[in-house]
């Protein structure tokens, strides 16, 4: 996994609650057996006026001028600010893949769906929970101030506006450690291989029917 | 003093990284269910890292999302879908993993076949790269959906790095009215607590209305726990659980069976267990439910009306409702029973088991679908459900009524195969999600129980199944 460095970037607002993973990356793109290339179909049904299909050249498609991410001021945005329960629905990791492939490195919301939140950390995309009134302000500023940026410091667990206002966020210690160092979680678990084997032997003795 | 969740969690902790009870632990996984959509990248990375599956006998694989529900003799026509299904088979062959292929009668929706085979047993941790893995919690399992990186993690280590959830008890006491099903309980709960109500929690369902449900009904309920935001839903073991499992292919036999049952009987919350949250519903108050919006929490009763956003004071909620009504093409104040339909879908990991098909068949028996219904389809959850239904003559009842009788798979629940809604089409669906575009771009989904979907097919619009003439 890629290390999460300190980051400063343009903020794109998506003022809507309960954005589900079907909206983030529609199911027809889930037929791919690859991990990359989902960015061009991020929010496909909102972003384009025509129906998207795998293999369709994005350059030939009709952009929806009313969709906020299509506005020129949000091009190159690295930070998405959105509403409650972002990423609800299916467990598809294709959703964080698509967000990351599009260029987002940080998603800020008052709350996230559990599986989505968990999936983000596995690929080095940072989901940040901030209180609703703070998110209100960030969305308002991103809508009104041209080129509005935020600076994210994972080490210090802060989100800083260029005006100097700083908001602290919580993140699990282990997840932070993995992100900051770009660690391979599987490798970390395999350091406990002996413990896993021992656990498994006990389990086999106590509940042999689980090993039929 | 322990909850069922505590017992399941504690029994699977291999190693705790710290003394913090809310810290990350290494959690052992007993059963890994695998399907074609969320596994190819996991297998690919596993191989690129020079690793192998830790315990192949814990894995059961099946292709369900992409498979056609029409004639399968010539395979899958869409080359991208075909490649994904073939990739699953190649991975399973390479590592000698048990897979039920498309021509195997045991093939079906992963959350139907696990329990059907007895591959889901009480006390297990069950994971799958699919959010509806919560279904298996009906068997007093700790079962939850994971992403592809975690699929790879479980393949490589038989474990996950996880953090304990909070607990929520949802208690439903009393007697369910005639025509009211597990699906209606699930939607009523989501209507009450919202789609984020269970976020960060594992839900245990309890109370005599839950005890009165069959295993099929309990699976429907736990299946929808994720739509309430909870990764896991679960129900303690009782005779209903044990009777369902007995004799299934992967279930223990003879001495081992007795030993297992003795242990399984302990898998329920202690009388004095403490939960972080408790939600109580009275079964008598639950009526047949119909969703009207683009989130499962946008739900009302069959005698209800489409809400008016003008009545909502919270601006974000109001905005969401306006957006949903526009997408759904519905006017505020419309009686639910006046909503006319184009298509009917009976199927999905929520409602495609034999009991669901029986309930729907009972409604349509001797009747015809309404002329405005362009397509009504029944997609059994597995080949075995299909053949049992055929033995009972249900296929003939459905077909005589004008329904199509299909091959098993996820089908129009998420429309990854050819079964989909066209833009603007309105569907009464027994599936679990009414998100925008879920059943096809521009499609409009109303979630209901199987008997409500069947009654809607006959009437051409929603109708109260409690007063529907048999």
UniProtKB/Swiss-Prot annotation, chain A:
One of its GO terms (biological process) is L-leucine biosynthetic process. It is an enzyme of class 4 (lyase). Disulfide bonds: none annotated. It catalyses: (2R,3S)-3-isopropylmalate = (2S)-2-isopropylmalate. It comes from the Bacteria. GO terms for cellular component: 3-isopropylmalate dehydratase complex. The keyword Amino-acid biosynthesis applies. Its EC number is 4.2.1.33. GO terms for molecular function: 3-isopropylmalate dehydratase activity. Keywords: Amino-acid biosynthesis, Branched-chain amino acid biosynthesis, Leucine biosynthesis, Lyase. Heterodimer of LeuC and LeuD. PANTHER family: 3-ISOPROPYLMALATE DEHYDRATASE SMALL SUBUNIT, 3-ISOPROPYLMALATE DEHYDRATASE SMALL SUBUNIT 2-RELATED-RELATED. Belongs to the LeuD family. LeuD type 1 subfamily. This is 3-isopropylmalate dehydratase small subunit. The gene is leuD.
